[in-house]
């Protein structure tokens, strides 16, 4: 399986890989896991049928796809122990704001980064 942003199944592949690794470790082992979900990165237009260019709609579709894969990952952690989850992005993305596209620029949208942390209870 591939994990790259051009694979429409990348998040499912990443979660499959992560769950497989978790299940191989003894349940009493402490685990640190970092997953960079590539589906949200461009290109993400392939998450909307017929779309040829990334935009807010395709970005939202990619986010919904990644969100749909998280329950399997969270359940694998719940089978082990209480787990601290930290979810964040490395940068935001412009989709036409002030005439800018994507994230290789200095713009407020690029610096706007979502963050959430929570405890998954066993």
What are these regions (language model features)?
Residues 1-122:
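Catalytic domains that recognize anionic headgroups
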């Amino acid at each position: 399986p591939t994990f790259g942003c051009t694979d429409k199944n990348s998040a499912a592949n990443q979660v499959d890989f992560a769950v497989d690794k978790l299940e191989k470790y003894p349940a009493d082992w402490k685990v640190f896991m970092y997953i960079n979900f590539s589906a949200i990165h461009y290109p993400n237009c392939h998450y909307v049928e017929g779309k040829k260019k990334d935009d807010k709609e395709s970005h939202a579709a990619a986010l919904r796809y990644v969100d749909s894969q998280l329950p399997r990952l969270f359940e694998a952690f719940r089978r082990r122990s209480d787990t601290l989850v930290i979810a964040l992005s490395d940068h935001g993305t412009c989709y036409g704001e002030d005439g800018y596209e994507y994230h290789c620029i200095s713009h407020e949208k690029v610096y706007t980064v979502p963050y959430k942390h929570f405890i998954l209870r066993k």
